[in-house]
Amino acid sequence: MDIHSYMKKNGFIWGPEPEIYDGVAGFYTYGPNGKKLKNKVEDILRKNFTKNSIHEVETPIIAPEIVWKASGHLGKFTDPLIKDIKGGVHRVDKLIEDFLIKNNDSPDNYNLGSMNNKEFLKFIIDKKIKSPNGLELKKEIINHDLMMETKVSVDRRAFNRPETATMTYLPFKSYYEFYRKKLPFGVFQIGKAFRNEISPRNSVLRGREFTQAEAQIFYSEDQKKEIELNKDILKSEIPLWSHKDQSERKLKKNISIESCLKKSIFKSRAFAKAMHLANKIISEFGFPIERIRFRQHNPNEMAFYAEDAWDLEIKTNSQSWIEVAGIHDRKDYDLSQHQKMSNKNLEAEGSIPHIMELAFGTDRLVYSILDIFMNQEKVNNDNRIVLKLPSSIQLNKFAVFPLQKKDGLLEKAQEIHSILNEKYDNVIIDISGSIGKRYRRQDEIGTKNCITIDYDTLKDNTVTIRDRDTMVQKRIKIKDLK
């Protein structure tokens, strides 16, 4: 079963929506299991940000035109587009990536992120790339505006936010008052953003509506270089793929934070701290370490105002490496722009603060989790699909099965379900179908333990508990369930 069929069948992700009207690409519904998993992802992000004294805020989704002029999005927030001879449109970088993968080549061998439109076109011509359905491409690349426009009141031009960050910066004066006019401090928000993508695809990996979890930490320029880092942070290692190693076609390396600072791989201690936090967060999802890397932006790929930028990438089974987060040193660019356009003073402690940003895509994390932890295996000539979720993100700790719905077994199952629900928030009861079918159903959604209530349960208060991963069953006392 392919990953998209699996997600649809098991109530993770449905769409494109609205399905009854044939759907619009780039818009999806999270079903009950999908929403539960997404909440787990967001809870891990929320917990880690909050533990690091980065506090949650919520800002508007829509802002007037002047905001996006100041931020630099208006007219400049674009993707390269190319048309085929029948008028079909294609996002250039993704077209090239798909071509390379199809031809057993890796996009990692080419600095696609640093190419301009002229270089893209030359690459397409040299490689004789065609559209996905084999049509010739026109020899022109144009920039497609990603901003989604709307109106406020009768005729005031406004736009949906294309990321949460800009709207998070705008209340800076209020933050500064709230934090008693002392730097550094941090805020984050988890919310929707919108981009008018040329060709949304691969489920929630590239949608027109998506969720971001972005933290913004404000420092003075001096603080950025001087903040204290404890021994645990300095000794911790991160899987890094520097732009130098990329250009020399070398693999990622595990390097300690301390070494990164000594070798000037990281340009400030504040940035090192942000990278450490991003690495700590991603480790909580239980991804195998070989599937994680931080890829540094090439100098000609990086935004002109950024001091440093790294993408946190996960290697999936269906899409190879995908970006799930970005860690950026944005210097004082954003607040400087908004100070200039608004004519409001956004200084703190005598200068405009610099911003460290950790920007996670929660939809991409959900997709990566399902893609990596969904396994298909043969068991006694039968196909078993099992979602081997790590404990930190498991949807259900227990599923309770009555062997029959009669003779008091259903009532006993409901009693045990109720007892377990007092201790845990992820216990379900499943009463339909054979026990074997119920095992398979729970395996598919990652339930860790299945508990069967049978006639012996009524006699001696014991149950059969079966482990998801090993399928081993054992008999234990109800009081020993944990």
Region spans (language model):
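NTP/phosphate- and nucleic-acid-binding module
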Residues: 1-482
